[in-house]
Amino acid sequence: MKERAAFINVSQENKLSIAYDAPTRERLSAALDFLPGVLLEEELPARKEELREVAYLFSTWGMPALGKEQIRAYFPGLKAVFYAAGSVQGFAREYLEAGVQVFSAWAANAVPVAEFTVAQILLAGKGYFQGLRRQERQGRAAFDSYSNTFPCNYHVKVGILGAGMIGSRVLEMLKAYDLETLAYDPFASDEKLQALGAKRATLEEIFSQCQTISNHIANLPAT
């Protein structure tokens, strides 16, 4: 007999259809018995009885932040939450304290984020963003004139704050370019930064020397 599972989110649409496409849902349904539709927080009281058997919850961006008592009341049989996105800081603590395991797709989510970040760094190195605003106001010649004042991405310094999953991928991808990367991360070892082609630096050094800086430090009291 299949264990019960459900999708939960703040809305019926949201990002669920992107994170869980049709083939993914088919594979999940082959192993688990899903409740119909998407659970919304406001529906939980009315569906309390059928939720008692739910062992697994699946979500992504838009995961409701339930309290520990709500979790225990509505999902007494819950074993795990699978979150198809990155950070779980907004909701995970209450589940963990209720004895529920939380799994995140933080490693997979880091791939497109790192790709996007590298693209932005390379564009910033050409003065693209400021130049575009000048072009909108003064025409293409203003863009070219401003962009030509930038050294582009050849032998310039780029600062990366944080060498976690995303920051590490960014540093690894930047090794393909003739850049000098400076990294600030008090938790990363010298060996790790060296393998990523980065030089350890202080915040003061990065902000005083680097043309472009990309921040990947979690917004937490500890960091």
Residue ranges and their predicted role:
Residues F7-I8, V158-I160:
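Hydrophobic Val/Ile/Leu positions in short beta-strands of Rossmann-like dinucleotide-binding domains
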Residues G167-S168:
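N-terminal Rossmann-fold NAD(P) dinucleotide-binding loop
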